[in-house]
């Protein structure tokens, strides 16, 4: 298995997302995967136009550590982080977050 950290010069999923969403131009839903570990990562992806962001690694870690209960706890934490992040930017629901809620990266 090859991970992004093993590929020099490859853009992170979140960095490539705006260009992918623009290229899709509403013709299809955009799903994104790779590097999403926290609820804030998911909210950022939604704000940049993704329909959803996959969070496989945290879920797999929860499974490895605590089985079904571990997965449930990881999903609970992600939900709580998403709700908090949405609240902090003044959104009640995930479909309300937009690019205007994302601060551009410095540099």
Outline where the language-model segments fall.
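Short, small-residue-biased leader/transition segments that mark boundaries at the very start
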Residues: 1-2
